[in-house]
Amino acid sequence: DEAPDGIEKAYCCIASNARDFARFGKLYLNNGKWNGQQLLDSVFVKKCITPRFEKSPEYGYGWWMHEIKGKKLFYMRGHLGQFVIVIPEDDLIIVRLGHLKGLQTKTDPHSNDLYIYVEEAYNMLAQRDKKNNTSH
């Protein structure tokens, strides 16, 4: 996707599938390593998921940071409600593809649907764990 002046848009608009988006999350979760090979400099990865501006501590380089229910996370979000959410403490990557996005409020820079996706992922994991524990 190119602007009329011939300059590429490098800030958005990746068309992909959930599995490939999850790979981005895994690459950053693993500090730039993929299958044991360092693809991205770990210092660069750390900078990406560290607050960049004092006035906007929720944003790094292309990644948002937040904490939900005591879990620190970082995530990418797209114009149409796509999310790649990484929760390192639980080795968890959540991907949401979509065509609609939630709203941000004046008091919260994170869209309201982020909270829903994280909560639903943990609900699904709890149901899975409950099912696995009762089937033994």
Ranges and model annotations:
Residues 2-15, 66-70, 79:
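Carbohydrate-binding/catalytic loop surfaces
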Residues 22-29, 45-49, 64, 119:
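Non-transmembrane alpha-helical segments in soluble domains
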Residues 32-40:
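Structural helix-adjacent loops and short alpha-helical linkers that scaffold large soluble proteins
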Residues 10-33, 82-98:
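Active-site-proximal alpha-helical segments within enzyme catalytic domains
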Residues 78-136:
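Structured C-terminal helix/loop/strand segments within mature extracytoplasmic catalytic/sensor domains
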Residues 45-97:
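Active-site Gly/Thr loop motif
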Residues 17-21, 44, 110, 114:
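Stable alpha-helical elements in mature extracytoplasmic
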